[in-house]
């Protein structure tokens, strides 16, 4: 029987689900943490998520739970896909469950914490009190639904530790998703922030243009 390493994805929104699919298609056994029981049940039983990824079939190696302890138990890598302004409070619940492990902690989030101005990797380091070499960030020109439909794309995995970055990149590679590594965590995170700002600006420009036609 093929052994699949377990990874946990904390947050079952569109990007968390999409990255969970990437990981499962790359050979991992993926356990999602979802806040709502009905969402966890749909992912586990129907292999669907009609709210965030309508029409997408999820891999059979993806399941979901509302229990953080169950999701994190035995996870060899932990991926965080939580709204950036809610990260700190959610990490407080995660901390006691990852304190005794050395599993890499991977941020899938873009943005900075408004109250402190800290980047997501800095919030993770501050709350979890973990070695920054254990933290990685993932970023790229990615749209969740396009990737969920398996349109070929790529991302960058950054960590102060090349070993951590490469371990995460290996886990997240599959036939339609390629991951490249670097150690420029700051540049990778701010690149993701700027990408979001440009996307919002372009959307606003299109809306204003349509109103003047």
Regions found by a protein language model. Give the residues of each.
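Rossmann-like NAD(P)(H) cofactor-binding subdomain of soluble oxidoreductases
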Residues: 65-73, 77-152, 168-170
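Hydrophobic anchor at the start of a short beta-strand
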Residues: 7, 29-30, 133-135, 179
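A short helix-to-beta-strand connector/capping loop
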Residues: 54-63, 101, 131-134, 175-177
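NAD(P)+-binding Rossmann beta1-loop-alpha1 motif at the extreme N-terminus of oxidoreductases
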Residues: 3-56, 64-66, 93
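Single conserved hydrophobic/aromatic residue that forms the stacking wall/gate
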Residues: 1-2, 207-213
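Internal alpha-helical scaffold of NAD(P)-dependent oxidoreductase catalytic cores
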Residues: 86, 97, 123, 127-131, ...
């Amino acid at each position: 029987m093929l052994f699949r390493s377990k990874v946990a994805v904390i947050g079952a929104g569109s990007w968390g689900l999409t990255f969970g699919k990437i990981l499962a298609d790359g050979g991992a056994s993926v356990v999602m943490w979802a806040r709502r029981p009905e969402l966890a049940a749909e992912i586990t039983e129907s292999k669907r998520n009609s709210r965030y990824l309508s029409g997408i079939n999820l891999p059979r190696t993806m399941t979901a739970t509302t229990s953080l302890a169950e999701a994190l138990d035995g996870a060899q890598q932990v991926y965080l896909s939580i709204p950036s302004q809610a990260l700190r409070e959610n990490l407080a619940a995660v901390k006691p469950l990852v304190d005794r492990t050395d599993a890499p902690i991977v941020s899938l989030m873009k943005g900075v914490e408004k109250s402190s101005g800290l980047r997501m990797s800095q919030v993770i380091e501050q709350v979890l009190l973990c070695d920054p070499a254990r933290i990685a960030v993932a970023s790229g020109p990615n749209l969740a639904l396009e990737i969920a439909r398996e349109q070929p794309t790529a991302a960058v995995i950054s960590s102060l530790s090349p070993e951590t970055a490469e371990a995460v990149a290996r886990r997240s590679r599959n036939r339609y998703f390629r991951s490249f590594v670097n150690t420029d965590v700051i540049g990778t995170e701010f690149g993701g922030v700027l990408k979001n700002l440009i996307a919002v600006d372009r959307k606003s420009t299109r809306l204003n243009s349509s109103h003047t036609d």
